[in-house]
């Protein structure tokens, strides 16, 4: 079995059914969020105001009604949160303090939004199907994200939408003009949708040392920079700590016909040895990441950037 999809023990969620009996299912969150401490059943008669009160209090809502109505509920909750977060706040004492306060206020609002919207839950069968009226067939997307499972489970609707979106990104790929091909991001791996940094690597002059001693790609992610350098004739060692990123980079190297030019290593920044060229597209916001995907953007205390500079 792929270690990325090893079916490890999961937390569980419990609720009372219509007869008052306790029911239980595995809880699955690819982002690593804990399950709600309390879960209640809900259906098409639950309005957005009542749902908002439950979710704000930390109660998860396990939806058993029409799937499309669950999506409408999620959209209505999002609009309520947008209105609340648009209210003006008290100005800070200085411009610097104002920027800092605004940043952390936005982060707190994003976390609260994610918590509330993440409380709308769906049941899943062991084949990753959603046993609700008008539910789409998401079994292939679920299998790709979770791997095989052995029992039914509960997951948030919001995360399911992310799983389906990632499935489509991976299937279609992201066009990379510098490669004249597509890169296929996996779930939880940052997608190279903005290509300015890719173009810089594609157009930068390569030194004699780079051709002689190869290149390191630190924090390779999808492997897009490693692929660009390999296409330019360099031997590349690409590193990452994320198993999902390494699997994604290996998949892209294979798709592009570059598995021999790119060596992938699990490492915290630098691999052993030296290289004639080192590239890195580090996270740039010095704040905690809320998920594996955000780790491509948020770098607590600039840990990766400091480590990269110290290791040069």
Where is each model-derived feature located?
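Glycine-rich S-adenosyl-L-methionine
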Residues: 292-312
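Short amphipathic alpha-helical segments and helix-helix/interface helices
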Residues: 117-118, 202, 309-312
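Residue-level signal for the nucleotide or nucleotide-sugar donor/cofactor binding architecture
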Residues: 192, 244, 299-303
